């Protein structure tokens, strides 16, 4: 993928980000709303989004639930030491579990950090997330050489890209 886009798409992309950086509007048809704000048709807006995705400017558009407001106040990043040659298969198994929100591979930093497979779980209690950890441990079986669970000590709010507003300059 190339991050090169046309100058006109770059201007539209900036406006699109400014319009949506706080989230998509809660309207019946957010694409129609965005199209109207950009002074484009819906088809042109969707084509713009596709071009931006194809160029690697946009990776994805997705709903991001607030786990805390949904009652999931306990989080655990489970970390696993598994054989590097088996991590792809094992990661797919773990990532496919319904209670794993995201799962990925990270480099080891030996001797301080031996873990290479990470899986985030959310629950309504410490016991629930510990139960999820046990389920992952059972799934990995003998492939799991060691594991730990890192728990959140405070809430960190994730945000998307934020652009500074352009300064208005007098003529």
From Swiss-Prot:
GO molecular function annotation: lyase activity
EC number: 4.1.1.111
Keyword Lyase in record: yes
GO-annotated biological processes: heme biosynthetic process
Pfam families: AsnC_trans_reg2, NirdL-like_HTH
Pathway stated in the Swiss-Prot or TrEMBL entry: Porphyrin-containing compound metabolism
Recorded phenotype for the gene knockout or disruption: The nirDLGH mutant lacks dissimilatory nitrite reductase (NIR) activity. The NIR activity is restored by adding purified heme d1.
The entry's keywords: Lyase
Domain of life of the organism encoding this protein: Bacteria
Catalytic activity: siroheme + 2 H(+) = 12,18-didecarboxysiroheme + 2 CO2
PANTHER family with a match to the protein in the record: SIROHEME DECARBOXYLASE NIRL SUBUNIT, TRANSCRIPTIONAL REGULATOR, ASNC FAMILY
Protein task: Involved in heme d1 biosynthesis. Catalyzes the decarboxylation of siroheme into didecarboxysiroheme.
UniProt record similarity statement: Belongs to the Ahb/Nir family.
Assembly with partners or alone: Probably forms a complex composed of NirD, NirL, NirG and NirH. All proteins are required for the total conversion of siroheme to didecarboxysiroheme.
This protein's name: Siroheme decarboxylase NirH subunit
Species of provenance: Pseudomonas aeruginosa (strain ATCC 15692 / DSM 22644 / CIP 104116 / JCM 14847 / LMG 12228 / 1C / PRS 101 / PAO1)
Organism lineage string: Bacteria, Pseudomonadati, Pseudomonadota, Gammaproteobacteria, Pseudomonadales
């Amino acid at each position: 993928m190339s991050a090169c886009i046309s100058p006109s798409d770059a201007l539209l992309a900036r406006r699109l980000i400014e319009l949506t950086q706080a989230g998509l509007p809660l309207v019946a048809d957010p694409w129609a709303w965005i199209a109207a704000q950009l002074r484009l048709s819906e088809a042109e807006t969707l084509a713009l989004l596709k071009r931006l995705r194809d160029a690697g400017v946009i990776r994805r558009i997705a709903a991001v639930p607030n786990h805390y407001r949904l009652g999931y106040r306990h989080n655990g990043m489970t970390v696993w030491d598994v054989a590097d040659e088996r991590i792809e298969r094992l990661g797919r198994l773990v990532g496919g579990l319904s209670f794993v929100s995201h799962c990925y591979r990270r480099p080891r930093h030996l001797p301080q950090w031996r873990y290479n497979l990470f899986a985030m779980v959310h629950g309504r209690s410490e016991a629930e997330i510990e139960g999820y950890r046990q389920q992952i441990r059972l799934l990995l079986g003998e492939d799991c050489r060691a594991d730990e669970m890192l728990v959140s000590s405070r809430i960190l709010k994730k945000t998307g890209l934020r652009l500074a507003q352009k300064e208005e300059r007098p003529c």
